[in-house]
Amino acid sequence: MKYLVLIGDGMSDLPLKELKGKTPLEAAKTPNMDYLAQNGVCGWVNNVPQSLPPGSDVASMSIFGYDPAKYYTGRGPLEAASLGVKLAKDDVAFRCNLVTVKGGIMKDFTAGHIKTSEARKVMQELDKRLGRKGIKFYPGLSYRHLLVVSSAVVSGAVKTVPPHDITGKKIHKYLPKSDILLELMNESEVILHEMKTKATMIWPWGQGKLPSMPSFKKKYGLTGAVITAVDLLKGMGKTLGLEVINVPGATGYLDTNYIGKAKYALKALKKHDIVFVHVEAPDEAGHEGSIPKKIRAIEDFDKLVVGTVVRGLGSLGARILVLPDHPTPIKYMTHTREAVPFVAWQANDKCQITNVKCWSYNEKELKKSKVRIKHGHELMKKFIGGKI
């Protein structure tokens, strides 16, 4: 048996008055996910333990089948793995955003979705002028970068806040309680002002040390691959011993190469037992608070990823799991910890046993289902074991 996991990041949402009480997922045209819902098993899964924040790092770890309460150490070390940065035992890795702050307010946690080519020059200049023993900057993709600091310089216990959680808010309440980090942030403002870039400062967050996790092959007996534009998921894949496949034109935004991701996934499925395909666009639209963009991202995910995969499977008896990692409601413009809707479907299996018939894939319709997975990391075992 082959397995595909299709992740629409932040896809689920709340009813909106602008959509006459519908969610973006409900308002979007999603014939392919609807087909899976009609012929598969629908349910709800909670990917975020109560003890942890509702980040993509925590929720994605659950989707991969690992208990975040046991293995999660922070986002930074996973992104370090993606960039090929080897952490020493005492290193603390921070995700380092390039952000736009004006008048003391977090205007844009993406710095206008700064181009990677421009961002690379910015990060190289920051490392040249601010980097020193125990402090190193690494360029990533667009606004997403890495800062590695020795624990002798900054404690991993320092409290930080994701910049996407404070869009439109004054930043002074959310600054890290660390003299070194504040110094780096303040000095970055001077450098970025000189460079005349959309980014006005750096924002370090999501810190942690290297996690110790068994490989996916060891835990589940399957070989696998990950397809994503996001360093976090690439790092997760590398940490778990999965092949990370880079797709040309994958941007982590609405202009990503959806079809390319689907086609590369089908090709990878010939080599591996399981392939994870992650699409960031719905989450980005949620953070922007844009209803039209979120609907467009969901429809593109359905048509170009889900549809391409389902049509391309042919006679291959693969199982498909479709789900978000967490909600990113338009109303809040950030992640929340509520359960998310999922559908599991098997190719060439006309009608699977389920407790209730769902006619479409959205939050309202799936409320009919009594299938509930309380601990998200348990879903993977049920999925590959044919228990759902």
Task: Describe the predicted segments one by one.
Residues M1-I388:
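Feature captures the catalytic ectodomains and active-site-proximal regions of enzymes
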